[in-house]
Amino acid sequence: MERQLRGIDPAKLNDIVKNALIADEAARHEQAARVEPPPVESQVSTVGDVNAEYYREIGMKATAAGQVGVLLLAGGQGTRLGSSAPKGCYDIQLPSGKSLFHLQAERIAKLQELASQHGAQVIVPWYIMTSGPTREPTETFFREHGFFGLDPANVIFFEQGTLPCISNEGKIMLDEPGKVATAPDGNGGLYAALRAPVREGQPSVLDDLHRRGVKYLHAYGVDNCLVKVGDPVFMGVCIEKQVATGVKVVKKTDPCLLYTSDAADDMQCVD
């Protein structure tokens, strides 16, 4: 426990807890800032857009030049799916029986194949952020499946950090006597994880990006089974607009939400 406590930065932890509790309290009293649509000038729609092919070409050229990488947020376990394995190992009941990791690996392979039409052999490095509970089983799963046909040298595993579990009163919780309870620090832990060595004594992800000449990263969550990994149209828009970050969304066209329930046979609309 002493070793755990020595690794905790009290000032940083206090800031995190304070901000979390303030945000929670504001949400309870509806004091949080209203969410407004982004400015029109910051939006680009590629649905039926004659410029979509133009953006795709930009994205493909960057991919062919080795400037595009893919970053997967895969620290979660499939507990809500009834599985203790990493989410990416989960069989989503497709006829093929392919896991989420398998589907995404195939899409990277296809992207490399398509981009190779614009130049020599193309490599799209795949950076996979795991967590303490998921790193070992994730790496084992990839080895057992031959990295789904990808070159292991271009699949880089790294690990997000952890934070002590804190009560609503701001007190550090114990997992058991003499052991601090900890949990992965969420997707926000990505930025620190990018700077940390992928393994002890090895370079960081940022070092690897620099070595490979990767300028653009497409980041996504592991449970997005429909993701267009390294989508050249999306990457092309971001490159052409010279933006530091971009978000790809499905535009909401109706104020109601459709959902299904085991308790009802009909689709229901909720405002």
Predicted regions and their residues:
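Poly-acidic low-complexity segments
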Residues: 1, 6-9, 151, 230-231, ...
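ATP phosphate-binding P-loop of adenylate-forming
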Residues: 71-76
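Low-complexity, highly charged intrinsically disordered N-terminal segments
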Residues: 1-47
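Domain-scale recognition of functional cores that engage charged ligands
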Residues: 40-69, 80-264
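Positively charged, low-complexity/disordered segments
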Residues: 263-265, 269-271
